[in-house]
Amino acid sequence: MAKGIFNVPDVEHIGDILHYESLIKDNGGTQVRHFWNGEEGDECFIVFFAETEEKIKNIKSILENG
């Protein structure tokens, strides 16, 4: 298992985070956790796992572009 970490720089509400988590799961990621203090405008870190480093790279690309 490979681990990926994605930074969401400006979270307005939990829906923003759930959108990224759905993209991760829809593209083969598992065991998603996020770390956000709940403050509007603060950053959030999303930690996820996938079978290979290549899959992690693909998921990160999707998150950055979609």
Predicted regions, residues:
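General helical structural elements
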Residues: 7, 37-38, 59
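Short glycine-/aliphatic-rich beta-strand segments at the starts of folded cytosolic domains
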Residues: 1-11
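Residue-level signal for functionally critical sites in structured catalytic/ligand-binding pockets
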Residues: 12, 31, 63
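Compositionally biased non-globular segments, especially hydrophobic aliphatic-rich helices
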Residues: 5, 53-55
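Short amphipathic alpha-helices in soluble, non-transmembrane regions
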Residues: 20-24, 56-66
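Acidic, low-complexity, intrinsically disordered interaction modules
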Residues: 16-17, 21-53
